[in-house]
Amino acid sequence: TFPPTSSDGDVAFERALTGSVPASENVAVKIQYNNGGVPSADAYLDYIILEAKRNLQGYGKQFRFQYNDADLNTGVIQYQLSSAARITQVWDITDIYNVQKVENNGADAFSFKAYMGEDRNYIAVDASDFYSPLKDSRTRVANQNLKGSILKNAQGSFQDLDYLIVTPAFLNSQAERLANFHRTNSNLNVKVVNLENIYEEFSSGKQDIGAIRNFVKYIYNNGSIPSKKLKYLNLFGDASFDFKNRISNNTNIVPVFQALNSFSLGGSIMSDDYFTMLDDNEGTMLQTGSQDMELAVGRMLVSDLKQAEEMVTKVIEYHAIESYGKWRNNFVLISDDVDVAWENSIQTGIDALGDQISAQKPFVNVEKIHTDSYVQEASAGGFRYPKARKDFVDAINQGALVFNYFGHGGEDGLAKERIFEKADAQNLNNRYKYPLFVTVTCEFTRFDNPYRPTAGEYTYWNPKGGAISMVTTTRQISVTTGQDINDAFSNELYGYGTTNNVPISEALRVAKNNYNGSALMVSYVGDPAIRLAIPKPTIVLTKINDQPVAASTFVFNALSPVKLSGEVRNVEGNTILSNYNGSLSVNIFDKNVQRTTFGNDGVTDSSGNLIVMDFILLGETIFRGNASVANGQFEFNFVVPRDIAIPVGNGRISFYAKRNQGLEDQTGYNTDIKIGGINPNATADNIGPRVRLYMNDETFISGGITNESPIFLAFLEDENGINTASGIGHDIVAILDGDENNPYILNDYYETELDNHTKGKVRFPFRNLAVGLHTITFKAWDVYNNPVTAEIQFIVVGDETVTLKNVLNYPNPFVSYTQFWFTHNRPYEPLEVQVQIITITGKIVKTINQVVTTEGFLSREITWDGKDDFGDKIGKGVYVYKLTVKSTLTNKKTEKYEKLVIL
């Protein structure tokens, strides 16, 4: 019986065992499995190799042989072969580039000698068993010259290359679309090179990751000067562990480096760093020693043209005008709870990172979601943090520049309590607010397994939401490595002590190069040339109630009217940008709040004390406003809500500005303002706000139809403004279908109108509502805590079908002009609409075809002048018309008939 194997968590084991077997042609191997007393435990046998000594005897085939103990001995060994008449030669293939041979002149028995001290490998060549080279079906190869053309421009002159995109030919169109964007938007010299061409020139046409690396090295080594060498490498395609395409639905689009050790999650590294280690004697990919990355690398996980188009579109949208907004001031950190004592370093480590970012880059609004500070609830599947999960997903949908998670995780999601899963990733709806997703966890984005798509991949793949890019883990990572890399990466990403803004992938490259250890399990997923969309400095508060800030002693008392003035200045903060015109968004926060985690799992330290953590949160948002910026200057007014915390202390103002002409954005902050106390001279106000409710747009009428994910709109007005300070019982809330135990808190979704703090709007997206009638009860408060309540009803119809209601034409009867109106359930979708005018005898006299897209559910875009298809005026009288609407996404259609009268 062979001895049992054991392990501390490896997924497979290889063991060389020595035993005695009978000297016969048939050998039986018996395996006895010890389950350790666990009936449910299983072992999975891959294969057994039986290796034994045998006589060197010819048998009509060529064969390989070696003496395994040769390296353990010194001196000379003699090999004797029998039945060797047909063995013409013995080859020494120990060095495949220097093969030696021993001749046999037809003797039935012959021998040769060799020195011991090392293992040597031989092949006995039988004259009747010569192998024939395989014939490649692709015998014609087109002329090409990558080496001669890659560093030349269209005119044939030398030009350094900034950005290389490597992709197979079938993805070329979208790779070129991305390249064209960066040529125009990023001023980079970009080239797209197909894998097939790289293989032809660097590996004789065969798939070889070494060929890709050697091609990249050739470009890098031939840059004109160090500062102009190749900077970015985009591996434009998904990857797989199966290089040989043996499995169905494989994703081996652009191959990735795979470590030889495939038996453990810690050792079975896959990494794209291999392609960037370009100095001499680098590229061994050992997890020890120093091997620097010479350029930044990223992989866009795309497997077909549709997916490629979606991911390139996200890159373009990340830079579009619609993506500019105050969400770019936000950073969200999320920590796992403490299940065992050593895990306390997870939450304390990332909390310290958040505080460091606040100190180094004070314009950043750091939101902290420490799961252990939420109430833990028991469920059938284990303990959960439903409120933390909701806050996590809501924060993504509302927008933040970076999400940074530290804790346990895996291919299916984050944390044992499942605070973020695959379904969450697929249902995110944060278009134009795509964040960088940083996950310090295990295997969250293990993208080389086609059998099991991960939550990380779904986060990236979401075409209308999710992440723009990810710094993420593909295998197991230790807490120490994760903490060190996360801190170093954040330092480079935000440029501590500087105003630098390097590409995200470059920040990771520098962090990994500076790390004294291996971080091969950390990968960058996404376009390596994009930079984090950090607004530029500097927006400055200059006056409070017309008094210079430096001289002001004003305290923001509850119910005090406040006027704030400021300027948009240059990066250094010393010169106003007098040609700056645009808009400003502002958030004013109450004093910071200190919180303590709960220690939900009851874990204690070595002294028996419950492990909890004190941490600092931003105060409640007491005002969200918008103002115009004219010639670099702005001002706005608001009334401080009654619900501020009364003790006086430092508050915070967060500014964000967007320029109208010459698209750019700026940021700023102030933490010197004082908030607290009550205004004893506040004017009386006992009148509540006024409100109007709609679904999707202002044409909606209560009781109308919607799709399954409508937008709820509430337009509010009050002479002193709306309260968003989250005082107890004074939140802006929506109650769906009377479920008061699960209200929707809408404070964060309220924004004032431009230059008017007395009016504003709530815009909240509902998701996946059930088909049927629904009622929303809405309640809001003004800053004096006077309430308003209103209600709206709507009918959800399934999104798969096209639903028509309220089909009419206006005016009707008409003389020379009418519009065709209808409500539908397909907002934001191009609809093919046809209107046919028919006489009472059935003759079609006019056909109108038009594609319409509406933000809401009402369409009134189609007009008719009363003329037929030939341009002639048709006669007076009654006509029938058929209105047909077809979805361009599902090809489903519906139609309705109505009457019209021409006078």
Regions found by a protein language model. Name each.
Residues 1-626, 630-639, 647-649, 655-677, ...:
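Cysteine-dependent hydrolase recognition
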Residues 90, 833-845, 879:
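Short, glycine-anchored, charge-dense loop/turn motifs used at functional sites
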Residues 795-810, 814-839, 849-851, 860-861, ...:
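Glycine-centered coil/turn sites that cap beta-strands in beta-rich domains
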Residues 769-771, 775, 850-890:
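Short, surface-exposed loop/turn motifs with a glycine/proline- and acidic-biased composition
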Residues 537-539, 681-693, 774, 802:
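Proline-centered linker/hinge motifs at extracellular inter-domain junctions
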Residues 72-78, 333, 550-585, 699-731, ...:
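Contiguous beta-strand segments within globular domains
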Residues 585-677, 694-699, 713-798, 852-857:
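Long, low-complexity serine/threonine/glycine- and acidic-rich segments characteristic of extracellular
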Residues 785-789, 844, 871-873, 892-895:
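A structural signal for beta-strand boundary/capping segments at domain termini and interdomain linkers
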